[in-house]
Amino acid sequence: MQKLKQQVFEANMDLPRYGLVTFTWGNVSAIDRERGLVVIKPSGVAYETMKADDMVVVDMSGKVVEGEYRPSSDTATHLELYRRYPSLGGIVHTHSTHATAWAQAGLAIPALGTTHADYFFGDIPCTRGLSEEEVQGEYELNTGKVIIETLGNAEPLHTPGIVVYQHGPFAWGKDAHDAVHNAVVMEEVAKMAWIARSINPQLNHIDSFLMNKHFMRKHGPNAYYGQK
């Protein structure tokens, strides 16, 4: 697990490097599907002092199997998403400014241009609010459940992120690095959408044919963007 712990540590350290977190407001995890184990950031540990060996290993029930610290308080959310979506290899949660602003506004981040379409096949959805019972009960687990409810039958790697109403963004990918990459993109397109709608409040969504072209040339069966 040492290699995966190092990868998760590096991915967590990318959050402050890319300006996605303040203090300890974020976490990254990754899963070893063969072993059924997840590596995740320890709860409340400052990035300035954190080391790879501080990463916490938990099983799919959330039991700590390796590590000196308690795992992130959002662990149950991560585990619920891993259980539901076998294609996920890494998950990120932050309170990045612009994506969180859309979450607090209760609005999906609209797909307005090709930067968005290169990564997200449509709007980045916003969940419904959790009920008082859901919050007072198994809050973090129910956060995962409301994300799954909102995604429905969507392919999660075609919609590699979401904003949870009144909370903040979650992003995911094929591994921890990919999940952080998608979290960075989500923050950037959230900022772009806010600016664009401020300039033109009547701005329409990106044309569907342009959306399809940009997403499929990177992610479709005949993708040709980048190097093989």
UniProtKB/Swiss-Prot annotation:
Annotated residues for binding of Zn(2+): D74, H93, H95, H167
Pfam name, any one: Aldolase_II
Active site: D118, Y225
Induction, as annotated: Induced by L-ascorbate. Repressed by UlaR.
GO terms of biological process kind: L-ascorbic acid catabolic process; pentose catabolic process
Cofactor comment text: Binds 1 zinc ion per subunit.
One GO location term (cellular component): cytosol
EC number, as in UniProt: 5.1.3.4
InterPro entries: Aldolase_class_II_sugar_metab (IPR050197), Aldolase_II/adducin_N (IPR001303), Aldolase_II/adducin_N_sf (IPR036409), UlaF (IPR023499)
Pathway given in the UniProt record: Cofactor degradation; L-ascorbate degradation; D-xylulose 5-phosphate from L-ascorbate: step 4/4
Binding site for substrate: G26, N27, S43, G44, S72, S73
The keyword Zinc is assigned to this record: yes
One of the record's GO molecular function terms: aldehyde-lyase activity
Function: Catalyzes the isomerization of L-ribulose 5-phosphate to D-xylulose 5-phosphate. Is involved in the anaerobic L-ascorbate utilization.
Family: Belongs to the aldolase class II family. AraD/FucA subfamily.
UniProt-recorded name of the protein: L-ribulose-5-phosphate 4-epimerase UlaF
